[in-house]
């Protein structure tokens, strides 16, 4: 990726950011496309298919990590699709965002077509996911935008800021395939058990039949059982997200335990803002009904458990003006 993680530009005419004032964001390599009208998503797809073809010709397995940059800002229109998005009620950035989505969709389709052409689709597992919550130029940061009905955007404490799409599928489903029998994925099935991006590494190792290097610490869980439609009873039904610094949703920790979710604020933005919010995600995935007053015992339990988890991980905390750590506490 670029030095700052997102492109200076999606346009080949602009060298994907190799222009004055954008060098830190410039996409490396791809010089052959500089000065052309090749959109970044298309250039990456061409190169990805080239590498896949090379691996097949050399008769070696491959792992492709295809990071499109899309749909990250800057929201620049992919002109191949712009004529389809003319709604005058949507702003220019929203229309550009729609073209980025379609360009990413076409990219995935082109790669799948290449797998089919090379006759390796039955043996190729595709994992499609986001790396953070939605950030489309729609709605406000703590409201409802492209992640609707989930609330919030990237970097916020709400579900729209941390949940991401995750799709696992064989490029060409075939029940008779020996490879797919090792990991049967039912077409159209849905898994509701918790999973995280940290699970990708151990899952890929498992599917590929590779052993974890000795003394190597693995943070995630193998998803094979969950991808097969089963429940992994060994997996804890908890998730801790610690955000002790300034950004959009500043100085908070969220802790999920089963269906319950706690949001704890170290530095509330206003005197009236509560330090803790409690939601039941099973009944209220949109986080509209705050329950800390209705369930004070559950709120206290969650704060205590969250604090224990933070201490176990050696977490850092925000500090006040005197330099004192602002550790969470049960305050009601």
Which residues make up each language-model segment?
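Beta-strand elements within well-structured catalytic alpha/beta cores of enzymes
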Residues: 62-67, 101, 108, 125-130, ...
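Long, internal low-complexity/basic segments
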Residues: 200, 257, 267-275, 281-332
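Short, solvent-exposed turn/loop segments enriched in Gly/Ser/Thr/Pro and often Arg
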Residues: 2-3, 65-76, 128-136, 219-220, ...
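Loop/turn elements at helix/coil->beta-strand transitions in domains of secreted/extracellular proteins
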Residues: 57-64, 120-126, 162-164, 235-236, ...
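Short, solvent-exposed loop/turn and secondary-structure capping segments
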Residues: 6-10, 74-81, 137-146, 178-180, ...
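C-terminal cap/loop subdomain of S1 sulfatases and analogous C-terminal strand-loop tails that border
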Residues: 134-157, 169, 173-193, 198-281, ...
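Metal-dependent active-site segment of extracytoplasmic phospho-/sulfohydrolases and closely related
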Residues: 61, 67-68, 103-142
């Amino acid at each position: 990726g670029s030095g700052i993680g997102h492109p200076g530009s999606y346009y080949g005419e602009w060298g994907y950011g190799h222009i004055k004032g954008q060098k830190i964001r410039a996409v490396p390599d791809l010089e052959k496309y500089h000065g052309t009208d090749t959109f970044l998503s298309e250039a990456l797809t061409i190169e990805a298919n080239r590498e896949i073809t090379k691996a097949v010709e050399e008769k070696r397995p491959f792992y492709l990590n295809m990071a499109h940059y899309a749909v990250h800002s800057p929201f620049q229109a992919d002109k191949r699709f712009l004529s389809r998005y003319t709604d005058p009620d949507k702003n220019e950035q929203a229309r550009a965002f729609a073209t980025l989505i379609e360009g990413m969709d076409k990219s995935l389709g082109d790669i799948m077509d290449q797998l089919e052409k090379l006759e390796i689709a039955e043996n190729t597992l595709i994992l499609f996911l986001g790396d953070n919550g939605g950030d489309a130029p729609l709605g406000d940061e703590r409201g409802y935008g492209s992640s609707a009905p989930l609330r919030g955007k990237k970097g916020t404490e709400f579900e729209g800021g941390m949940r991401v799409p995750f799709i696992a599928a064989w490029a060409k489903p075939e029940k008779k395939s020996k490879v797919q029998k090792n990991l049967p994925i039912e077409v159209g099935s849905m898994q509701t058990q918790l999973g995280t991006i940290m699970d990708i590494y151990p899952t890929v190792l498992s599917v590929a039949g590779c052993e974890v290097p000795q003394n190597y610490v693995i943070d995630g869980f193998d998803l094979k059982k969950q991808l097969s439609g089963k429940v992994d009873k060994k997996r804890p039904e908890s998730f801790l997200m610690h955000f002790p610094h300034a950004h959009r949703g500043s100085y908070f920790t969220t802790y999920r335990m089963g269906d319950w979710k706690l949001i704890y604020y170290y530095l509330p933005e206003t005197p009236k803002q509560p330090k803790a919010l409690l939601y039941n995600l099973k009944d209220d995935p949109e986080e509209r009904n705050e329950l800390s007053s209705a369930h004070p015992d559950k709120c206290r339990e969650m704060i205590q458990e969250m604090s224990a988890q933070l201490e176990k991980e050696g977490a850092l905390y925000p500090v006040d003006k005197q330099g004192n750590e602002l550790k969470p506490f049960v305050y009601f």
